[in-house]
Every structure is written in C-alpha cells, then in structure tokens.
Amino acid sequence: MSLRRPAKDQPETFEFNSSSLEAANIVVSKYPKGKQQSAVMALLYIAQRQNNNWIPLAAMKYIAKFLEMPYIKVYEVATFYTMYNLSPVGNFFVQVCTTTPCMIRGANKLVEACKEKISQHESELLGDKSCSWMEVECLGACVNAPMMQINDEYFEDLDKEKTLEILDKILSGETPKPGSYRGRVNNEPENNRKTLMDLKNA
C-alpha cells in the first residue's frame, strides 16, 4: 500500500456551502440517531467535490465536528482510501487504469499521452494548475479497455491518438464526449456479434 500524506500547503478553514450542507444532512438523516459517524465516507466525498477535487485537513476537522466523532477517525478514513485526494489535483483529474486488462490493451500509450500533455510525473500539476494525472488500479470497465477517468466521466476504448485529442479538448476548455471511442454502445462486442447461435460446434 502506498504512503499517502496530506499536502503541505493547507487552507486554514473549511465549511460546507449551502448545497453541500443540504446533501450532507440528507445523507446523515439516513442513519439512526447515534450512528451518524457511518456517513463519514459520503461526507468526505461531498467535501472533496466542493473543494475542487481534494480534501484539506480543515475539511476533515469540520466533518469530525459535524458527525461528532474523533478527528483522527476521519483522518484514518481519508488517508486510507485512494478515492480521496489529499492534495490539489486541478480542475481536471485524469486517472489512467493500468491494471492487467487495460495494460494488455495498451494502457502504457495512455500514460505516454498524459506525460506529453500534462506532466512527466504522476500527481504533478500542469503549469497552470488546471490538471494532473495518475495511474490507478481497476476502474471496473475492463471490457472497454484501455480506459481512463476524468473527474466523474469514463473514456473508454482508447489509444494514444484519441487520448491526446481528449486531453487537448479539456486543456482548451472544451468538454469531450465520454464513453467508447470505438463507436461501441456500452460494452457490446467489437465485431458486433449479438448472439452465439450461429457458431458451429468445434
């Protein structure tokens, strides 16, 4: 397991804005009285979305107070799960899956594209601090390998050229279309076979 440390530069304060507070209260209301600490993961995610895709220490302290639980417990959860970013990742956070199915299908080319367009090293912000990238474990879209996730969207069936095009779009302020880049609908077969009924016995 990799060592995960919070960013050195931290904001002094954090609090939920009105929409985040509403979302947090809805989540907490789903738990019995005295069990609201179970909402910690959801509230960390809400805080991350509000704070430009990362969670500062001030947010962890705020959530601890909000849920009436020890700060160290919130810190333990936030630093354990890699879905929580402990330092700034920019407006566009690119996650490239490099688990076996994606790697077999050419994920290394997607990594090359990220190094060319964003930075040579993982978790290193682009010069204007708008974007960063990192390799991640399985994102659950193996049938559409290789693929990457940008913020909340999946981009699938990629190669280096298509990845460069997508990165060019986000860096120029455009919104690329998520989904398959081989024209597939969801995870249909690449050769468009819809049935096995016409296959002859071996």
Regions found by a protein language model. Give the residues of each.
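Signature of N-terminal electron-transfer/Fe-S-associated modules in redox systems
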Residues: M1-A202
